[in-house]
């Protein structure tokens, strides 16, 4: 892959929310370019719009003005070539680990049996192959987040969006997960946008770090 090819482009992005009494500006004139296969962290204080920016790039949140493009195509809705990992694993407790990983395939209307081997491969890669038939409640927080990463990768997306995925973990588990994520990225060379509060985490993981200012945020 050509790492100099621009994969994600954000231009003059603005996002506002309307309350009963006023219009709140969540993001103001954000500019960003991310190259293909690059690992980029988005760093900034609480409430500066990091998660808002990430969800907008994923097509999960409408924007007020500006443009977002992935592979030169404007983002207006969720894209099949994008995977998302949220702050909490949000696994379905009644489904097994393997069934949780395969859930996006069902949502996309694809044949689940065609992706069973890939689910097994991802679970093996993250050390969870022995837990494929377990329920989420039988796994630790760190293990559940690894399941969430497998789920985000099951349809082989080119772009992976991660919204503070390790913020709820203890320090040792978080360090282990950072090592695991870096290994996965080095093996698969996806483009990763990673939201975090931690300067240490951002520096450890990233090719580059984007820093957002306090509200009204800009970059």
Feature map (PLM): residue ranges:
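Catalytic Walker B motif of ABC-type/P-loop ATPase nucleotide-binding domains
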Residues: 160-163
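Conserved ABC ATPase "signature" region
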Residues: 106, 113-131, 183
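Short coil-to-helix segment of the ABC ATPase nucleotide-binding domain corresponding to the Q-loop/switch region
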Residues: 95-103
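Conserved ABC transporter NBD signature motif
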Residues: 66-78
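Hydrophobic anchor residue at the start of the ABC signature
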Residues: 149
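The feature captures the beta-strand-to-loop junction immediately N-terminal to the Walker
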Residues: 43-45
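Helix-to-loop junction immediately C-terminal to a conserved catalytic motif
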Residues: 58
């Amino acid at each position: 892959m050509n790492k100099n090819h621009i994969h994600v482009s954000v231009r003059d992005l603005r996002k506002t929310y309307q309350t009963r009494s006023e219009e709140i500006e969540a993001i103001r004139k954000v500019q960003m370019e991310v190259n293909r296969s690059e690992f980029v962290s988005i760093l900034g204080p609480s409430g500066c719009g990091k998660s808002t920016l990430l969800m907008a790039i994923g097509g999960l949140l409408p924007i007020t003005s500006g443009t977002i493009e992935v592979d030169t195509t404007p983002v207006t809705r969720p894209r099949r070539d994008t995977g998302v990992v949220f702050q909490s694993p949000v696994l379905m407790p009644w489904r097994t680990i393997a069934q949780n990983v395969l859930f996006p395939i069902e949502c996309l209307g694809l044949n689940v049996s065609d992706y069973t081997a890939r689910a097994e491969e991802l679970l093996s890669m993250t050390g969870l192959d022995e837990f494929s038939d377990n329920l989420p409640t039988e796994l630790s927080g760190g293990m559940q987040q690894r399941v969430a990463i497998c789920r985000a990768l099951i349809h082989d997306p080119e772009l992976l969006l991660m919204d503070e995925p390790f913020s709820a973990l203890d320090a040792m588990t978080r360090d282990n997960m950072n090592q695991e994520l870096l290994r996965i990225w080095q093996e698969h060379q996806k483009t990763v946008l990673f939201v975090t509060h931690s300067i240490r985490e951002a520096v450890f993981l990233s090719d580059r770090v984007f820093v957002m200012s306090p509200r009204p945020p800009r970059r």
